[in-house]
């Protein structure tokens, strides 16, 4: 049970609300602080602790993390509830456990897929049957050889017989080519197609799940499932199925032939097959178990990686890359442990199989000699039976390397199909429920009780009844965690209330069709999520499912532009070089917060919805935009039902009804004037936010406590559009005399098209470097691989000896028995040696392979964290793409280690030893046979090359589609509220379709070469028999010499063929190695690991910007700072204000040295920061940003991420927490500092998360404190307290604060007003108000008085 889960009846836990995601608003701050208690003193409600399980736009939590609640725990936690309430919670959390059989992997195969598979199966079986048929020809030729050696037939008769049999071999070869080609292409095609269907069904299922289900899922988990796990399935149902069927067909056909020839001998030899099956069955059980545990650990690691990469600015600012990497490595170590066990079991299983096979030969040969002496069978039949058993058993050895792929596929599918089979209780795809032809939009909550499924022990809303009349605006206010966002979640039907009803025009919304309901509602959240496409398409998403969806393109464009104008976004959009076609980047990161918010508002109003939900819709805007957008929203709200949640009370004064929520209950409601007159909680909230303007009473005589008139709005709109027009004009920066830094010169160009190419040898050395510490294991593995590879050539000699022993005449039967006993014993000895060598080689390479994967993942993760911020701004380095790279590509690296490497070495030894023995015993025949081997190798190499090309092409397509799926699922609330589920699925489907088409051509070409390499074995055999037979006919060779040369080369060549069945793994490995090498070779312009530059001992805190010009590397055409000059004296508190997109946050980013300026210089204490040691410099800075970043782990661990050291005195920690006003709250939790915060801090509210982030910043005791809208996520109460804490913390250090809420910065020593990347005004609050310039206008807009 998570530490936050305590007695549901205790006052501390009386109310903990799982937060919203896109509705982060509060997410639960606790009114423990004295100030907060005072403000709510009129209310007799108990003090509450509210914790919530979601953050920002939904990033689901990891099921493997501590905060996930298991079903059994849920049962215990909800035991005190009535049965019907328990049922509501359980249906929202229920998980399906599915048992998948291997054939279940094809559950989505189409009729065409099945037809292709049937044909491919027939061909694979036919291909496998070809080799055993050779034993019949072999028996026939053996007797022919015996007759020519005894001079029983003439040379001509012999030659005719020989030619006829050799031609049969050629026909078999042609048949083999056709069947192998068809089966390989067929299985790769159906494998890809079936996996595509699984990917599509999985995404569809994820999109139809209820939001409560996501509250316990890790963000990295969906990415891992849709990339790594589906790749495992594809690996298990593609060409390896064909290879396995072929091997099994060889086995079965060979044994049928053996039984027909002489069943007694065949039966005795078959006894070991039972032992083989038992060995495989027992081993597979362990393999599945260990494989699943390893996958689970990698999934948990994926979630950590996703959390860290998605908040890279925070990790960089605090220099905590090493600590975070260690957290990631904990999961990697766990995965390595289970992975190693898995591989060791596999090694022992293969060793046992080889040991049993060789023992089988010894047994068969020994019994055969007895039957021969008894006269029950002749030499030819024994040879056919033994040859058939040899080939059959050998082919069974080819099955085992694929067994792992099949078991992994089944393990991966179990989780994926579990999600696919889950019936969502709130299914947006469902057609159930009625739709209303006409409705007014009257919303009513009647006796609603709500409990979040992921926090079942806490009641967040108790018996709330609230009427929100049609066409009116209802505002919800109250402290963090009071249940405001819960109302939004219930109206959108993200959750089901456990009791009571939510009504729309008197209809219970659970009787209405879910998709239809959401299409009538538009939601704008505090932290808007845009999708990685153009502005135009983002706004157009608001039309999905509405009556305007299928309008003409001209009409749609008109609607979109009107919506943008209404949201005050049209001007800034048209000022962008590409206008509405500008790509906003993943989650809209290329736009400022205010710009994103305005596009989100445009998206919400474009469909003219009947119901509008505004969850702090203007909190991310600066005052100027807010005033205009607020007026636009008020205009948009006319005639429709609007629910507004606001921390800034100035935005809701005009609401028809204001509802004050505290502790999940309604404290009071009424209009602004009524509530202020009443003097209750609302009045105190208003006073907390009032800007202190007494000193400027004269200056503000006319403007005090007034709101904007329409004329003011029009004036500001004109001003804002006029100023925005400047953006449209190309700004030339005169760079004469300025030195453009290397980084900006490089960054301002588009990424180069060419990527470095590496030779195979370079990549092999590179991969080997990961295994340097395992050299002893590697050497053991290599030595034992060589020994294991010697088994087959030894067996060929033993086999030839067996044939010559069995050919002894009756007069030498006593010698025959003696020799038979000896050679049989030799087979048994070889079997024991094979068991030891195969097992040891498997275990040694298991250690190497798993450590390689762990080390590669760890190093890659650390290298990613080393990169500069510009690297993460690029589309190809999005969170999804990098998380996918870590999970998938590292797995591929093992294609040149472990089992593959061992098998290749073993095969090389087999081939080498076979050639040497053959040359020593009969060089003429050996040379003829060897001549074909280079052709075999060339075919295999070319196939390897083809697959590497195919791999690099397909990787891009899958990465793009996986990234798209990750973006959609991590923004699930936005997708759900826009009813974009089908749209998302269709885009994903189209991306996968395109990938399927490109890969097919590549598969057709590469399979041609693979089939050739298989067929050449038969031509090789034909050539060997023909030439060897000729030598026998001329009595140059005896039977022993012929069979040694022939067996050595035959099986040697077949081994050479099997090496290339590993070509797909090697192809993937080569491509992955190149990707890794490219990443490791990338030297960031601002290197977080760099030891260069001057290290600072102390910092006074004087800051100066001199004529700084800057453009973001991803948008070089868009100037951001245009000659910024700014001075901050040591210890000053400086505030930056201005419209969104004017360069305030950019100034903070440049000070943190996330980027380098294009021109000009930034000085701290008179030193250019680009010349300072980066880590030394950053250690004197602390950053608190608008969106607080917490990681999975405890509160204490999160606060300690503020410093590099692991140990810090307890009193420092406590002081930082007290300064941030979070200490009392932490102490009120049952687990105190050891409380788990959940994925991305989701168990805490926005206000609580922000205060933990502030404590983390203060723990560093920074000389320079950077506050980027540090209090914007807080409600008035928390903000007042935290602001006081920040004011106190700012004493004695230089502080730069970016703020939209002017009440937070009126005491600043200097306020700089930004516009268009320059400073237009500066001075103190009172000086600037007296100037009556731009700042005065902003103050006026935010003034909080009584209503109109």
From Swiss-Prot:
Example GO molecular function: ATP binding
One Gene Ontology cellular component annotation held by this UniProt entry: mitochondrial inner membrane
InterPro entries given in the database record: AAA+_ATPase, ABC1_TM_dom, ABC1_TM_sf, ABC_transporter-like_ATP-bd, ABC_transporter-like_CS, P-loop_NTPase, Type_1_exporter
Localisation: Cell membrane
Residue ranges with Polar residues bias: 1-10
Residues bearing glycans: 99, 314, 550, 877, 1088
Membrane topology value: Multi-pass membrane protein
Domain ABC transmembrane type-1: 118-408, 779-1068
Low complexity bias spans: 20-31
Protein induction: Expression is strongly increased in the presence of cycloheximide, camptothecin, imazalil, itraconazole, hygromycin and 4-nitroquinoline oxide (4-NQO).
Regulation: Fenamirol efflux transporter activity is inhibited by the cyclosporin derivative PSC 833, nigericin, reserpine and valinomycin. The effect of reserpine is transiant, while that of the cyclosporin derivative PSC 833, nigericin and valinomycin is proportional to the time of exposure. Cyclohexinmide has inhibitory effect only when applied prior to addition of the fungicide.
UniProt entry keywords in alphabetical sequence: ATP-binding, Cell membrane, Glycoprotein, Membrane, Nucleotide-binding, Repeat, Transmembrane, Transmembrane helix, Transport
Keyword Glycoprotein (UniProt): yes
Binding site for ATP: 478-485, 1138-1145
SMART domains (UniProt xref): AAA
Transmembrane regions: 114-134, 168-188, 240-260, 268-288, 344-364, 371-391, 778-798, 825-845, 892-912, 925-947, 1015-1035, 1042-1062
Main location: membrane
Annotated spans, Disordered: 1-67
GO biological process: oligopeptide export from mitochondrion
Boundaries of every ABC transporter domain copy: 443-688, 1103-1341
Family statement drawn from the similarity comment of this UniProt entry: Belongs to the ABC transporter superfamily. ABCB family. Multidrug resistance exporter (TC 3.A.1.201) subfamily.
Function, as annotated: Pleiotropic ABC efflux transporter involved in the protection of the cells against a wide range of toxic compounds. Confers resistance to the azole fenarimol via efflux transport. May also be involved in the secretion of penicillin.
Protein name, entry field: ABC multidrug transporter atrD
Organism annotation: Emericella nidulans (Aspergillus nidulans)
Upper classification of the organism: Eukaryota, Fungi, Dikarya, Ascomycota, Pezizomycotina
